[in-house]
Amino acid sequence: MEDAAAPNSGSEFNPGARRGKSIDECQDMIRRSFRNPIVKFLMEQMEKSGCRVGDNFVKAVVCTGPVAGGYTKGRGITVCSNYLTIQDEVNQVVIHELIHAYDECRAKNLDWTNCAHHACSEIRAGHLSGDCHFKRELLRGFIKLRGHEQECIKRRVLKSLRGNPYCSEVAAKDAMEAVWDTCYNDTKPFDRAP
């Protein structure tokens, strides 16, 4: 994904998007995302849980694969400047990846090589970040009035797990189905899905 290192978990890129921003432009957008109420809340919750979110925790990079960003244990969040063009996209990636970081913070034994662990964090990130709100799905070309959110989350979880070398297609689907109810209904640190 990123030139330096592959993340444990990444956000899906919209292939229909225009060419992205420079690293400096993207870094400015990241700084602006820190004013987003959900981003602020997630960062505060990480700090309260004992996980420091330093100045370089979220950084803009040039990515080699068609992804929007990722979270890597011990390194933080990367936002792919070359695939993002507007502030809302950057906000969305930062929120999605902060949920992965929060999951790792609160579950000290989270193992990204374990398909069930990875699936659970992807389910939560998809559900809690708003990745699958109706408007976003419509813009991606997925038009369905009923059940679109859960269908979207499942599609995106499986796509993310395909990038995990420890999860075969069958193992990914089985893991997602096994943890779905528990992880979809786990809205921590929110009282309910935003």
Swiss-Prot record:
One of its GO terms (molecular function) is metal ion binding. Keywords: Hydrolase, Membrane, Metal-binding, Metalloprotease, Mitochondrion, Mitochondrion inner membrane, Protease. It is an enzyme of class 3 (hydrolase). This is Mitochondrial inner membrane protease ATP23. Disruption phenotype: No visible phenotype. GO terms for cellular component: mitochondrial inner membrane; mitochondrion. InterPro entries: Peptidase_M76_ATP23 (IPR019165). It comes from the Eukaryota. Has a dual role in the assembly of mitochondrial ATPase. Acts as a protease that removes the N-terminal 10 residues of mitochondrial ATPase CF(0) subunit 6 (ATP6) at the intermembrane space side. Also involved in the correct assembly of the membrane-embedded ATPase CF(0) particle, probably mediating association of ATP6 with the subunit 9 ring. GO terms for biological process: proteolysis. It is a peripheral membrane protein. It holds the Pfam family Peptidase_M76. It is found in: Mitochondrion inner membrane. The keyword NADP does not apply. Its main location: mitochondrion.
